[in-house]
Amino acid sequence: MSWQTYVDDHLMCDIEGTGQHLTAAAILGLDGTVWAKSDKFPEFKPEEMKGIINEFNEVGTLAPTGLFLGGAKYMVLQGEAGAVIRGKKGAGGICIKKTGQAMVMGIYDEPVAPGQCNMIVERLGDYLVDQNM
């Protein structure tokens, strides 16, 4: 299965039969290279990705400044140290799950709830961890 198929079929899927979808999603390498992404996934700056990668290695580094992706600023929420970063921006937010070799990212806006985004992103991330990816 291609990385794009994971994004299209497992991240941008219909959420629990509601007809709702994440706004954007991507799978990136731990060096910040894009492996696959949805059409609306934002273009990001290298320093934004560096900040995200740093947060996984040194938890708490993004809390004072916020998480930036594609110029959008997210307030960092409680995640799982070294494994999950969650952020909030207005009525939407972001969830990032780190695996052994990749980062799975999902961005949502209302009416999608934070928990729905977290479930989709973390479920695929957990599967990839189980596959030693």
From Swiss-Prot:
Any Pfam family: Profilin
Major site of localization recorded for this protein: cytoplasm
Superkingdom of the source species: Eukaryota
Sample GO molecular function, one term: actin monomer binding
Name by which UniProt lists this protein: Profilin-2
InterPro entries found in the cross-reference section: PFN, PFN_euk, PFN_sf, Profilin_CS
UniProt entry tagged with the keyword RNA-binding: no
SMART domains to which the protein is assigned, alphabetical: PROF
Function of the molecule: Binds to actin and affects the structure of the cytoskeleton. At high concentrations, profilin prevents the polymerization of actin, whereas it enhances it at low concentrations. By binding to PIP2, it inhibits the formation of IP3 and DG.
Subunit structure and binding partners: Occurs in many kinds of cells as a complex with monomeric actin in a 1:1 ratio.
Localization per Swiss-Prot or TrEMBL: Cytoplasm, Cytoskeleton
A cellular-component GO term for this protein: cytoskeleton
Keywords assigned by UniProt, alphabetized: Actin-binding, Allergen, Cytoplasm, Cytoskeleton
Family to which this protein belongs: Belongs to the profilin family.
SUPFAM superfamilies: Profilin (actin-binding protein) (SSF55770)
